[in-house]
């Protein structure tokens, strides 16, 4: 499996600090029992970064904007 880099994730999330917060939140979710959204046999943090790079996990503000857009329709 190809190596994941922060630069891969920065294509989806423009702020490094937000990227770190998203990855940490996702790792905590894994530890609470949530299932990964992408196949991975790596450590939790690598799996979280893979999910972000694959756009399976998005920032909350993007999610809120999409929900508001759906309500407007």
UniProtKB/Swiss-Prot annotation:
Keyword Translocase in record: no
Reactions accelerated catalytically: RNA(n) + a ribonucleoside 5'-triphosphate = RNA(n+1) + diphosphate
EC number: 2.7.7.6
Function: Promotes RNA polymerase assembly. Latches the N- and C-terminal regions of the beta' subunit thereby facilitating its interaction with the beta and alpha subunits.
Subunit structure of this chain's protein: The RNAP catalytic core consists of 2 alpha, 1 beta, 1 beta' and 1 omega subunit. When a sigma factor is associated with the core the holoenzyme is formed, which can initiate transcription.
PANTHER family: DNA-DIRECTED RNA POLYMERASE SUBUNIT OMEGA
HAMAP family: RNApol_bact_RpoZ
Family note: Belongs to the RNA polymerase subunit omega family.
Name of the protein described by the UniProt record: DNA-directed RNA polymerase subunit omega
Organism: Oleidesulfovibrio alaskensis (strain ATCC BAA-1058 / DSM 17464 / G20) (Desulfovibrio alaskensis)
Lineage: Bacteria, Pseudomonadati, Thermodesulfobacteriota, Desulfovibrionia, Desulfovibrionales
